[in-house]
Amino acid sequence: MASPSLLQSSASSFHGRFSPLAAPSSARMLSPPLRNVVKVSASGTVLVEKSEAEKTQRLKTAYLERIIPALKEEFKYVNIHQVPKVQKIVVNCGIGDAAQNDKGLEAAMKDIALITGQKPIKTRARASIATFKIREDQPLGIAVTLRGDVMYSFLDRLINLALPRTRDFQGVSPSSFDGNGNYSIGVKDQGVFPEIRFDAVGKTRGMDVCISTTAKSDQEGQKLLALMGMPFREGGGGSTGAIVRKKKLKSHHFDAKGKGKR
C-alpha cells in the first residue's frame, strides 16, 4: 500500500503537468450577429433575408420610387405630404346564415384570413330588425382592416392575380368612388385568389373591398390607383382618362339563313 506522502507527490505532479480548462466566457458562447436578416418574434415565423423581404413589397416600392414623382408632376404638389396614398383597405363579407351556421362562419373566417393574411373579426347587428328577422348582437358577417405592408401585399395580389382570374373580366368600374377619393369594389367569388383551393371551397362567397385613400378628389384617387395598376374599364362616368382595359364588343352569331342572333 502506497504511503500518504507518495500519493501527495503523485497528485501534485499530475496537476502540474495538465493545466485546468478555462471556463468559456459568455461572449464566446454567443453566435456572431446575423446581417441582412429581418428579425421576428418567436411566433413560429422563420427568419427571412432582408433582400427577399423587400422584393415582396414591390407595389410599395413602386409607389415610393415611381408613383409619387408622377403624381407630383401631374397635380403640381408643392409638399410631398400632399401626394395621395392608400391609407387602409377594409375587406368585409356578409353571411346571411351566420347565426344558424357556425361552421359556415368559421370557414368564411378561415378563407378571409388566408386571403388577407390577417385574422378577421365578426360583425354584429347593432339593433334588432323584425322585418329581416335580425336580433341585436347577432353575427352578420366578418370584416378585416389592413394597413402597412399587409395592405400593399393584398392590393398587389388583388390587382395582378385575383381580378384577371375573374370570369369574363372586362375591367373595374371607374364610377365607384365616393366623392372623396375612396374606391369600393366587389369580388363575387373568393376562389379567384390563389390562396384558396377550388376543391376546398365549400360554398362560393363574395366580398367587398373598400380602398381608403388620402386623396381630396375622385380624380386624384383614380389616378393613384391607375398608376398602381388598377384595371379601370372604358366609360362608366370616370373623372379621369386613366383607362387600362377596354370593354369588349359582343359578337354576333349567324344561323344558316343569315339572320343575326345575339
Swiss-Prot record:
<dbReference type="GO" id="GO:0019843">
    <property type="term" value="F:rRNA binding"/>
</dbReference>
<dbReference type="InterPro" id="IPR020929">
    <property type="entry name" value="Ribosomal_uL5_CS"/>
</dbReference>
<dbReference type="GO" id="GO:0009570">
    <property type="term" value="C:chloroplast stroma"/>
</dbReference>
<dbReference type="GO" id="GO:0022626">
    <property type="term" value="C:cytosolic ribosome"/>
</dbReference>
<dbReference type="InterPro" id="IPR031310">
    <property type="entry name" value="Ribosomal_uL5_N"/>
</dbReference>
<dbReference type="GO" id="GO:1990904">
    <property type="term" value="C:ribonucleoprotein complex"/>
</dbReference>
<dbReference type="InterPro" id="IPR031309">
    <property type="entry name" value="Ribosomal_uL5_C"/>
</dbReference>
<dbReference type="GO" id="GO:0005829">
    <property type="term" value="C:cytosol"/>
</dbReference>
<comment type="function">
    <text>Binds 5S rRNA, forms part of the central protuberance of the 50S subunit.</text>
</comment>
<dbReference type="InterPro" id="IPR020930">
    <property type="entry name" value="Ribosomal_uL5_bac-type"/>
</dbReference>
<dbReference type="InterPro" id="IPR022803">
    <property type="entry name" value="Ribosomal_uL5_dom_sf"/>
</dbReference>
<keyword id="KW-0689">Ribosomal protein</keyword>
<dbReference type="GO" id="GO:0009507">
    <property type="term" value="C:chloroplast"/>
</dbReference>
<dbReference type="GO" id="GO:0009941">
    <property type="term" value="C:chloroplast envelope"/>
</dbReference>
<feature type="transit peptide" description="Chloroplast">
    <location>
        <begin position="1"/>
        <end position="39"/>
    </location>
</feature>
<dbReference type="GO" id="GO:0003735">
    <property type="term" value="F:structural constituent of ribosome"/>
</dbReference>
<dbReference type="GO" id="GO:0003729">
    <property type="term" value="F:mRNA binding"/>
</dbReference>
<dbReference type="InterPro" id="IPR002132">
    <property type="entry name" value="Ribosomal_uL5"/>
</dbReference>
<dbReference type="GO" id="GO:0006412">
    <property type="term" value="P:translation"/>
</dbReference>
<keyword id="KW-0694">RNA-binding</keyword>
<keyword id="KW-0687">Ribonucleoprotein</keyword>
<dbReference type="Pfam" id="PF00673">
    <property type="entry name" value="Ribosomal_L5_C"/>
</dbReference>
<keyword id="KW-0809">Transit peptide</keyword>
<keyword id="KW-0699">rRNA-binding</keyword>
<comment type="subunit">
    <text>Part of the 50S ribosomal subunit; contacts the 5S rRNA.</text>
</comment>
<keyword id="KW-0150">Chloroplast</keyword>
<protein>
    <recommendedName>
        <fullName>Large ribosomal subunit protein uL5c</fullName>
    </recommendedName>
</protein>
<dbReference type="Pfam" id="PF00281">
    <property type="entry name" value="Ribosomal_L5"/>
</dbReference>
<comment type="similarity">
    <text>Belongs to the universal ribosomal protein uL5 family.</text>
</comment>
<keyword id="KW-0934">Plastid</keyword>
